[in-house]
């Protein structure tokens, strides 16, 4: 992901980030506007953190939810939760103040965590699509093919590959020594802008779009197979019909999650690629909106689960009613109608 950052003032630069030569201009908002933005961002962070904390708790606590698919959902929820806890607070200050006040070390760390958690979410959604494809298109072999051990391998890859990739570009001199012709110097003092160059923008394009293409192609096949299964469901036994219905509903729910992900991330991803060709002419305010639209995706998954998964609503009800503290609650069958 391109490291973002308000480089200058959008309308009336009333001040500078620092009282030094080469400082970035700063847009000073009225107190009312600042308060509204801070409250909106705080509400978004609260939804992201609390929603994903509950998903992680439910899957961890209730034994009925200890399935390969749900372990992937748990890992996805942790990535979104950490984004809300560790990245968005500083992103909020950067967006409101239009400057970065936390130094080079935190700038690099913030960019690392931002990129890590976002790429981890993308990889997990791709792996969940593979899981659903296997469950719908090859249901007889699915229990033996997609085991908990396989899910744990996917989780390890979903965290390990983004961590290694991001570390390579942010904490080594590989880019600077071998691709120095692509790099541009920091435009001004007070921006958190790392590796802002054409190579960085184009390299991130396939990292976002290849998983997207995989997810779309898998869900197209899932839709075709699920439609055919729905037409044949009357010939199945009651137990097999119920299992097939459950798998199709899970695939539909996760398909909605993938669709919302695409809507949230497409503006930012396309702009990152196109903007690198046009010498980064996107206004800072517009680019910041694209970034927050992408962040919004982390709040969507728990909301989708509330409206789509009966087990999620049951787990939420048990938790809020404090029945979760009963020893028998952990073994409740949340999938029972």
From Swiss-Prot:
**Glycosylated residues (UniProt):** 21
Q: How does it sit in the membrane?
A: Multi-pass membrane protein
Q: Name one GO molecular function term.
A: trimethylamine receptor activity
**Where in or outside the cell is it found?**
Cell membrane
| Assigned keywords, A-Z | Cell membrane, Disulfide bond, G-protein coupled receptor, Glycoprotein, Membrane, Receptor, Transducer, Transmembrane, Transmembrane helix
Q: Which domain of life is it from?
A: Eukaryota
Pfam families (UniProt xref): 7tm_1
Region of interest (Extracellular Loop 2 (ECL2)), residue spans: 176-189
Q: Which parts of the chain span the membrane according to its record?
A: 35-55, 71-91, 110-130, 155-175, 205-225, 254-274, 285-307
Membrane topology (Cytoplasmic): 56-70, 131-154, 226-253, 308-337
InterPro entries from the entry?
A: GPCR_Rhodpsn (IPR000276), GPCR_Rhodpsn_7TM (IPR017452), TAAR (IPR050569), TAAR_fam (IPR009132)
The record's GO CC annotations read: plasma membrane
Entry's family note: Belongs to the G-protein coupled receptor 1 family.
Give the protein's biological function. Answer: Olfactory receptor specific for trimethylamine, a trace amine. Also activated at lower level by dimethylethylamine. Trimethylamine is a bacterial metabolite found in some animal odors, and to humans it is a repulsive odor associated with bad breath and spoiled food. Trimethylamine-binding causes a conformation change that triggers signaling via G(s)-class of G alpha proteins (GNAL or GNAS).
The entry's protein name is: Trace amine-associated receptor 5
Name the lineage.
Answer: Eukaryota, Metazoa, Chordata, Craniata, Vertebrata
What's the gene?
TAAR5
């Amino acid at each position: 992901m391109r490291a973002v950052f308000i480089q200058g003032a959008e309308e009336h630069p009333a001040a500078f980030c620092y009282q030094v030569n080469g400082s970035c201009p700063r847009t000073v908002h009225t107190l009312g506007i600042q308060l509204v933005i801070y409250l909106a961002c705080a509400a978004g962070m609260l939804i992201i953190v609390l929603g994903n904390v509950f998903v992680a708790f439910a899957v961890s606590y209730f034994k009925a939810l200890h399935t390969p698919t749900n372990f992937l959902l748990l890992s996805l929820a942790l990535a979104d939760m950490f984004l809300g806890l560790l990245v968005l607070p500083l992103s909020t200050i950067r967006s409101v103040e239009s400057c970065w006040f936390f130094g080079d070390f935190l700038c690099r760390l913030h960019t690392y965590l931002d990129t890590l958690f976002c790429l981890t979410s993308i990889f997990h959604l791709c792996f969940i699509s593979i899981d659903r494809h296997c469950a719908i298109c090859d249901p007889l072999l699915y229990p033996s093919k997609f085991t908990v051990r396989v899910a744990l391998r996917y989780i390890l890859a979903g965290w390990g590959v983004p961590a290694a990739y991001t570390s390579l570009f942010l904490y080594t001199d590989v880019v600077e020594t071998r691709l120095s012709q692509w790099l541009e110097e920091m435009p001004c003092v007070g921006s958190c802008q790392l590796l802002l160059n054409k190579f960085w923008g184009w390299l991130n394009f396939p990292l976002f779009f290849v998983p997207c293409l995989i997810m779309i192609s898998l869900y197209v096949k899932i839709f075709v197979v699920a439609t055919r299964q729905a037409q044949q469901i009357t010939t199945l036994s009651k137990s097999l019909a119920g299992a097939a219905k459950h798998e199709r509903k899970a695939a539909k729910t996760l398909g909605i999650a993938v669709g919302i992900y695409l809507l949230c991330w497409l503006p930012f991803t396309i702009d990152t690629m196109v903007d690198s060709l046009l010498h980064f002419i996107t206004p800072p305010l517009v680019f910041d909106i694209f970034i927050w639209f992408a962040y919004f995706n982390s709040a969507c998954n728990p909301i989708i689960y509330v409206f789509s998964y009966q087990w999620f609503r049951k787990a939420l009800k048990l938790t809020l009613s404090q029945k979760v503290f009963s020893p028998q609650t952990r073994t409740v069958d949340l999938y029972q109608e």
